[in-house]
Swiss-Prot record:
Main location: cytoplasm
Domain notes: DEP domain is required for function, perhaps regulating the apoptotic fate of the Q.pp neuroblast, but appears dispensable for subcellular localization.
Gene ablation phenotype (knockout): RNAi-mediated knockdown causes formation of ectopic A/PVM-like neurons.
UniProt feature, compositional bias: Low complexity: 184-197
Species: Caenorhabditis elegans
Annotated spans, Disordered: 19-76, 178-197, 209-228
Residue ranges constituting the DEP domain according to the UniProt record: 72-164
Protein name according to UniProt: Target of ERK kinase mpk-1
GO biological process: positive regulation of apoptotic process; regulation of asymmetric cell division
Subcellular location: Cytoplasm; Nucleus; Cytoplasm, Cytoskeleton, Microtubule organizing center, Centrosome; Midbody
Entry keyword set: Chromosome, Cytoplasm, Cytoskeleton, Kinase, Nucleus, Transferase
Superkingdom of the source species: Eukaryota
Composition bias, Basic and acidic residues: 52-61, 214-224
Gene this protein is translated from: toe-2
Amino acid sequence: MSSSRHFSIPYDEDVVHSVILENTPSPPPKPPRGILRKEAPMKPQRSALKIEPARDDDKENNSQPQARSQFKAKDTMEQMQSYFKRSISVLRKSEEHFTGAEAADILTAYIETHRNEFPRDNIGRSNAVKLLEIWLESNTIQSVESHQKKFVDSERTFYRLGGDSESLYIVNTPIASRNHDDSASVSRSESSRRSNSIKRLFSPFVRRNRSNSRGRDKDKDNLKDGSSTNLKSTWSLFSSSSEKNEKKLKKAEQQLIKEEEAEVYELSLFHLLSLIDVEFLEDVALPVQDSKNNASFLSSILGKVGLGASEERLDPHQEDHMDLLIETHPLIRDASQWFQMARCCAPLLYFEAKPVASNHKTSHNEQLYLWCRAALDAVKNRLEKMTQNGSSPLFPSEFAPLLTKIAQQLINDMDSGEKLSTAVMYIFLMVPHPIRKTIDQLVQWLQLTMRTDAVEDLRSPYYLGKKDPRRYKENVNVIIGELSSFIFPRGCMTNVQQDIFIETLVELRQKGKLGQRPAQLESSLRAKSVNGQIKWQRKERKHNSLEGDLTPVRYTVRRESIRSKTSKSKDGLNETDSALVTMINSVIDNKELSLTEKKKQLMNFKKFYPKLYNDFFPGMI
């Protein structure tokens, strides 16, 4: 049919519809716009993304409409978090911390109970652990240890609930369909209904309805991009500001702890100086009422010792293995507390179920000895590394003059009574808290050693020398002998004095007094917090100090007046001897000279003028 003939027939709609009968086949649907065009389209055509339907969707029987919200997955996440928090509150009524294994158990139980709401691949404990990792990143839960960045499913890792801030959840979902032209709106709505069954976790900070069309208005695109960028930047600012506030609070808390430690150190030193007489304190921080100077002094002591978050630890699975071995092995069961305390003293302590790989069969005594010896070696290696092979012992080298005077005046004095215990309590409180905690763990380990005979002889299972019927005494001596060089400064005490000092520490811990503040110290702290100063209770002696002076008398008046108690008058001396005594007094009172230089000058004076030394400076060296 030609085109001229076609246009010659008039078009009448009624006639056309009357011609088409009921049995006439209907014409095919009109193809989409642009298919039959001969010329190239103005815009490049984009084919729709192929979206596979979900497994539980039925292609043929799609009679039941799906009325799910696009925030269904977000609601599911909120329900999971609410269930998790309720379960934690029921499980831990009085404690705010929970273990990684408990968190994984709770979330796995929820997923198993609501398995119909999750894809088949997302059911199981491994997916619960993955979700807990996401919660840890989004601050829904927080690790107790700051260096723990990854969630660990273990009984030895502890967490706490975080804030209720919005979080960006990242899950593996099919790629979302992109918007097309208006002609594809029907297919897009069907595909969106199918994609609702993916259980995607939505977040208000995820950009949605992004358009790749080049024909959109640039202002709208800029507005959308700007709003999304603002949301993301707001989230980043919120998280960064919260982290900064957290760091500030932690820093302020640490500063308060340091100042409190400095006050305890200062007042403990004052009370200790009322029990012992020390001539030179240049190596010890002078007792001044300045908490900042004392705090910096304690920080310098703590900086010499290798303690902190950088210390190595076992893998959580290895720790679980050690727990199981110590609690269930028949050879270790009776000494399980001793081994657990050894693990507190040496976190890297680890041994296999069969520590000896040799041809001959190991006896039970030998195997237990190897385990006990491995525990002692692990503690020794840790202290050796922590103290730099004893150069920075747990009782700092700066306290050597105090320890020496405690040994000479209290330990050697059989009639010292409670003075020795009180002095040990004061000098223990003067040690910085992290080091004090390590000393307390060692004392507790020795205390457990004294209470059990289940630990094998640490010298040898076949030791043929003289043995004490109570095996623990020999083991205590072995432990003290191998660890004392890392506990005390070198040369400040003899071996016998070190044994008595450690026995005093153990006795104080058995009575519950180790680490506790004596009544006099508590009253001094209260008086200082209320009045800002303390009225020092002086001894019965004559001196020139003021009534409210805090420092003991021998540090508040000139050295000449102190020495005048035991020294003779210079009236009967000739001019030369009087000048020599005055010169030595000026040397002792000179603050610019070091302790070594003063001792050297006194030794030379004693060598060349022994009579003057014995008359005016007895016992100064």
